[in-house]
Amino acid sequence: MINSIKTLLLIATLAILSACGWHFQQSVTMPSEWRTLALESDDSYNDFTVIMRRKLQENQVNVVNLEQNIPILRINKQITSDQVASIFKHGREAEKLLMLEVEATFRLANGESYPINAKVNRTFFDNARAALAKSEEREVIWNDMREQVARQLIVKIIALQNQIKRK
């Protein structure tokens, strides 16, 4: 009897959670005073800057041109590298470790600057027999890594608000 009640309670809980649309960390919200900011980069049309702009807009942030009295997110440096992670018996590369690191600065409207950075690592199977598929897969992985780093930067900006409030 008790086991059937536990099972029924578990099924009811799962049904309620899946029916109401509740998800773990689906999205995060930017503080209201930072809902308008400028995105600054050396190359405003490179892949990462475009993805960062899109991710900010998905989080209801209005990205504007450089103005006075608004926060600025400056992308300082984007570092990409790949290292051999494993090799085949005959000495060819089998697997690579792809790394993407972005260093940025978040400057508040009052002029205070806070450095933030994010880093993502992925492995990539380097199949020499499928050269075209390999390059396409590699580009998909790099784009996914850029999106993940952009999400990490947004989360760190939101966490920065709590750090500033504690001062």
UniProtKB/Swiss-Prot annotation:
Residues 1-19 form the signal peptide. A lipid is attached at C20 (S-diacylglycerol cysteine). A lipid is attached at C20 (N-palmitoyl cysteine). It is found in: Cell outer membrane. It comes from the Bacteria. GO terms for biological process: Gram-negative-bacterium-type cell outer membrane assembly; lipopolysaccharide transport. Keywords: Cell outer membrane, Lipoprotein, Membrane, Palmitate, Signal. PROSITE patterns: PROKAR_LIPOPROTEIN (PS51257). Its main location: membrane. Component of the lipopolysaccharide transport and assembly complex. Interacts with LptD. Belongs to the LptE lipoprotein family. This is LPS-assembly lipoprotein LptE. The lineage of its organism: Bacteria, Pseudomonadati, Pseudomonadota, Gammaproteobacteria, Pasteurellales.
